[in-house]
């Protein structure tokens, strides 16, 4: 039960609230609101659970065709139906597992990739400005300036993953780039 101490109230650190079982305590109010916004975007049928149809619709919206097998594998990662609390628990598990950080980054970018392993620049720019910590137009442009974009407006996912994960603690890999 290791909790990150970057929460809003460090004075309550010594107090245990229910043995740390409240996943909402692991995130700031802003983070919870952003997760909720993302959940609501994904819960297309508004039944409070992200199912296969919801995932398919989300992938379709970002221009990524996902196979039934891919969708089934994503849903199988959850130990129970994915309601909002389960989604938060899944993010919390990922956040506390430091060795998974690079894998999480890779999976996030691969979710946007087409069959050739590329991301459409315009689709990615739109996602940066729409979801999570929304980028401004200038911030999105700055981020895209750091990426190799081919003449067709495509970004190589593996190049982005390597760029982002190389500095994650392996100084030799960071110097190599």
Curated annotation (Swiss-Prot):
Disordered: region residues: 1-24
Tissue range of expression?
Expressed in tail muscle (at protein level).
The UniProt annotation places Ca(2+) binding at: 43, 45, 47, 54
Q: Where is the EF-hand domain?
A: 30-65, 135-170
Transmembrane regions listed in the UniProt entry? none
Composition bias type Basic residues, residue spans: 1-16
* Domain of life per record: Eukaryota
Q: Which GO terms describe its molecular function?
A: calcium ion binding
| Classification via PROSITE patterns | EF_HAND_1, EF_HAND_2
Identify the GO cellular component terms for this protein: myosin complex
Keywords (A to Z) from UniProt = Allergen, Calcium, Metal-binding, Motor protein, Muscle protein, Myosin, Repeat
Stretches the record annotates as IgE-binding epitope: 13-30, 22-48, 49-66, 58-90, 79-99, 118-141
Complexes and interactors: Myosin is a hexamer of 2 heavy chains and 4 light chains.
Which PANTHER family does this UniProt record tie to the protein?
Answer: MYOSIN REGULATORY LIGHT CHAIN 2
Please give the name of this protein: Myosin regulatory light chain 2
Q: Which organism is it from?
A: Penaeus vannamei (Whiteleg shrimp)
């Amino acid at each position: 039960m290791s909790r990150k101490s970057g929460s809003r109230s460090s004075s309550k650190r010594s107090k245990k609230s229910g043995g740390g079982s409240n996943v909402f305590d692991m995130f700031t109010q802003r983070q919870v609101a952003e997760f909720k916004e993302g959940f609501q975007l994904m819960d297309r049928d508004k039944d409070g659970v992200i199912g296969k149809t919801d995932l398919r619709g989300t992938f379709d919206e970002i221009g990524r065709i996902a196979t039934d097998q891919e969708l089934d594998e994503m849903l199988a990662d959850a130990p129970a139906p994915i309601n909002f609390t389960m989604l938060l628990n899944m993010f919390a598990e990922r956040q506390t597992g430091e060795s998974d950080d690079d894998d999480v980054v890779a999976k996030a970018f691969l979710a946007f990739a087409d069959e050739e392993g590329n991301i459409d620049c315009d689709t990615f720019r739109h996602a940066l400005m729409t979801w999570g910590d929304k980028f401004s137009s200038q911030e999105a442009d700055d981020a895209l300036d750091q990426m190799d974009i081919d003449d067709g407006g495509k970004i190589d996912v593996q190049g982005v993953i390597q760029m982002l994960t190389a500095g994650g603690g392996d100084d030799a890999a960071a110097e190599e780039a």
